[in-house]
Amino acid sequence: MNSCTLAVKVVPGASRNELCGWMGEAVKIKLSAPPVEGRANEALIEFLAEKLDRPRRAVTLVRGAAARQKWLRIDGLSLGEVKSLLGTHG
């Protein structure tokens, strides 16, 4: 089974959840959830699972739980497939 690690730059507390594009090798995502008690992390996992059409359990936070720069493991997709699904402007 394929899996990859995705770098994400998170902006919590935004007015809405939004994919903002690529910043080098990281994708920038704005989330409406606040960075309190793991809410932004949960919102990020749910947002990416929906965008990538994967079950929630296929998206796992592996690094950066308390930081804005995060790394997530995506099971079942290669990095190329993830980039294609999220948009290739990066």
Spell out what each predicted region is.
Residues M1-E46, D53-R56, T60-A66, K70-G90:
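Contiguous, often N-terminal, cationic amphipathic patches that form binding interfaces
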